[in-house]
A protein has these predicted regions:
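Short amphipathic alpha-helix that is part of the acyltransferase structural core
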Residues: 1-41, 138, 148-180
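Gram-positive cell-envelope targeting signals
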Residues: 5, 13-18, 99-100, 115-117, ...
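Conserved donor-binding loop and adjoining core beta-sheet/short helix segment
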Residues: 28-98, 200, 204-233
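Acyl-donor-binding surface of acyltransferase catalytic domains
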Residues: 89-153, 239, 254-285
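A mid-sequence, solvent-exposed acidic-amphipathic segment
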Residues: 172-209, 214
């Protein structure tokens, strides 16, 4: 069964949840086994469940024993439901089924997204059994900027601002129907993003967009776009070099980047380190 975690019981169970979060076979995404995020990061984010609208932590119990911890958040205006942690010591299949039933009852009409390490075989099998669609499989790569040396940059790569944003929108808009971070949403929050495009014959031949997190020590590349989705290895590497150099100068400490099979070798060549494989599932409630 699932029951709401009350604020006064947070300290009683958070250590248990964190230990599970370090084990990719027992937890979901975001992972805390990447060598970047800390125990303090986990505790701070999980505690926010008691101060943010649309968030709640559920304890998963079997025979009176707490075996799991699920922290979800709901964005009603976007009909979006996701989790910040999905940690289960035993009974992952049952936990997934019960959370699915809970979500259907409370958030009908929303899209539920659940991300897990590919190493969490029980979770992946349970999601498939519940009729979820796998919408992404990728490599989870990290960059430690202490180990990164700036590289020569191409003059064909330029930064994007509000003034020249249309160059980026021209290429990114082809994906607007398939992702949360549409061109308009990125523009609305542009101060928290680093965006670059590769210009060829006056047009964008590729674009990269990285989100800077609030403490400005960590970022994530959310995507690299190409016209008609046709991959160009040279453009990809030049865009990566530009954003890596930029964030090195800014003082960013770590970067996360999820890559597909086609681009993984180029990401590794630019200095990223792979910590595991990620799978994302989606289901309409």
């Amino acid at each position: 069964m699932l029951r709401k975690l009350e604020k006064q019981d947070f300290d009683r169970y958070v250590e248990f949840a964190y230990e599970l979060a370090l084990d990719m076979t027992k937890s979901g995404y975001p992972t805390y086994a990447d060598g970047i995020k800390t125990k303090n990061d986990f505790i701070t984010r999980e505690r926010e469940a008691f101060s943010r609208d649309g968030e709640e932590i559920l304890l998963f119990e079997q025979d009176g024993k707490v075996n799991g911890w699920i922290h979800y958040y709901h964005l009603p205006e976007d009909h979006y439901l996701d989790t910040t942690s999905f940690c289960v010591a035993e009974g992952m299949s049952e936990a997934v089924s019960e959370f699915m039933a809970f979500a259907r009852e409370n958030f009908s009409g929303s899209e539920l997204y659940l991300g897990f390490p590919k190493e969490n075989i029980e979770a992946v099998e349970a999601l498939n059994a519940c009729g979820f669609e796998c919408i992404e499989e990728s490599y989870n790569n990290v960059m430690n900027f202490e180990q990164y040396m700036q590289q020569p940059e191409s003059a064909d790569v330029i930064p994007i601002t509000r003034e020249n944003f249309q160059l980026f929108a021209d290429i990114h808009s082809q994906y607007d129907d398939d992702m949360y971070w549409t061109s308009q949403r990125i523009l609305n929050a542009i101060d928290g993003w680093r965006v670059f495009v590769f210009i060829r014959e006056g047009k964008a031949a590729g674009a990269i967009y990285s989100r800077i997190f609030e403490d400005k020590t960590m970022s994530e590349i959310f995507g690299v776009d190409f016209p008609d989705g046709i991959y160009d290895g040279r453009v990809y590497r030049e865009l990566l070099t530009a954003v890596l150099n930029d964030e090195k100068r800014m003082g960013t400490k770590h970067m996360v980047f999820f890559c597909d099979e086609e681009s993984q070798s180029d990401a590794l060549a630019c200095g990223f380190h792979c910590v595991g494989e990620y799978v994302c599932f989606q289901k309409k409630l």
